[in-house]
């Protein structure tokens, strides 16, 4: 009598199916983390503008409008720092609105990743940046 060693075809197929299910679950959970990372990057990018914008309004300079919805152009007149670019390919981040009142040393700029009110939105003022919407 010979001793058979090895796995049957059914056992191998079951193992492959289990690996496939685990890979599917892993990929699904990681794609959500990727979007959260893009959103966190947008928040960091917008927070980096705040000290420059605050310096502009303290110098009684009005903030200038970005050249495109994803950034570009000087933050205010007389400086070389530009509005930073936002991730537009994968998450569709874009600047929505900009207001500044140099006499009051106040400003506000808003960026969103989709439809304002439901999508992740960041509102920055002289006191800080605030996240709102879903997807964080």
Per-range role (PLM):
Residues 54-136:
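Periplasmic/extracellular, small/polar-rich flexible segments of pilin-like filament-forming proteins
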Residues 35-62:
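Membrane-proximal N-terminal amphipathic helix
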Residues 2-3, 34, 48, 124:
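Generic N-terminal leader/processing signal
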Residues 2-30:
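N-terminal single-pass transmembrane signal-anchor helix
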Residues 19, 30-37, 72:
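Alpha-helix termini
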């Amino acid at each position: 009598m010979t001793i058979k060693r090895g796995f049957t075809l059914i056992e191998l197929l079951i193992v492959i199916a289990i690996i496939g299910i685990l890979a599917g679950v892993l990929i699904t959970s990681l794609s959500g983390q990727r979007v959260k990372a893009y959103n966190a990057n947008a928040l960091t990018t917008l927070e980096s503008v705040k000290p420059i914008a605050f310096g502009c309004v303290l110098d009684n300079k009005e903030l200038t409008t970005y050249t495109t919805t994803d950034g570009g152009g000087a933050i205010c007149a007389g400086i070389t720092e530009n509005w930073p670019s936002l991730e537009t390919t994968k998450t569709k981040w874009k600047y929505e609105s900009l207001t500044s009142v140099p006499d009051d040393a106040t400003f506000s700029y808003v960026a969103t990743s989709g439809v304002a009110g439901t999508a992740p939105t960041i509102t920055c003022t002289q006191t800080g940046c605030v996240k709102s919407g879903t997807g964080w």
